[in-house]
Amino acid sequence: MSRIGNRELKIPVGVEVTIQPNNVIVKSAKGQLEQAIPSVITVAAKEGVVTTTRANDVKHSKQLHGTINSLIQGMLEGVSKGFKKELEINGVGYRAALAGNKLTLSLGYSHPIEYKIPQGITITLPKPTQIIVEGISKKLVGEVAANIRNYRKPEPYKGKGIKYKNKHIIRKEGKSAGK
C-alpha cells in the first residue's frame, strides 16, 4: 500500500486543489468533488503536485494512505477528463428512452422501468439499445451503470439483458435432445 500512497499526483491544467484540515476539494470548469481525509493522513499540494503522507506505520494507516492517494487521483482525473461507462441492451423488444431526468427501460417485464438520473450524471442514448453514462465522479458513474445493469443482467443462454460494452458474456449450451 505504501508504494501507491507515496506517489506524487500531478495537478492537471485548469484544476484547483483546496486542502482543508479534514477535507480535500478539487475544482475545475466541469465541477467540484470533495473527499474526507482521516486524521492519520496528511495531504499537501505545492508546485502543481499533490502528495500524501501518513502519521505512523500501523497497518490501518498504510491501507488508508494508498486508498486516499488513489481517491485523490480519481478526483483529479474526473474533474479534468471525466468518466464514462457504456452499456448495451440485447433482446427482442428491449430498449431505453430518455425523458427529462428519467431513463425509461423496456426489458420484457409487464411494466416499463423508470430510473431517476442522479445529479452530476449525464446519460445519452445514441441508439435505443445503447446507454452512455458520463460524469466527473468515478464512484457515481460506476454505481449508476451497475444499477441500470442490475435491472436485467445478461443471461447465459441467449445473452439477453444489459451488459457493459466490450464485455464478453460466457454462453452456455442449451439442453441437448435425449436419445
Swiss-Prot record:
GO BP of this protein: cytoplasmic translation
Pfam families: Ribosomal_L6 (PF00347)
UniProt-listed InterPro entries: Ribosomal_uL6-like (IPR000702), Ribosomal_uL6-like_a/b-dom_sf (IPR036789), Ribosomal_uL6_a/b-dom (IPR020040), Ribosomal_uL6_bac-type (IPR019906), Ribosomal_uL6_CS (IPR002358)
Keywords noted in UniProt: Ribonucleoprotein, Ribosomal protein, RNA-binding, rRNA-binding
RNA-binding among keywords: yes
A GO MF term: rRNA binding
The keyword rRNA-binding appears for this protein: yes
CC terms in the record's Gene Ontology section: cytosolic large ribosomal subunit
Functional description taken from the UniProt entry: This protein binds to the 23S rRNA, and is important in its secondary structure. It is located near the subunit interface in the base of the L7/L12 stalk, and near the tRNA binding site of the peptidyltransferase center.
Family named by the database record: Belongs to the universal ribosomal protein uL6 family.
Self-association state and partner proteins as the record states: Part of the 50S ribosomal subunit.
Protein name: Large ribosomal subunit protein uL6
Organism: Spiroplasma kunkelii
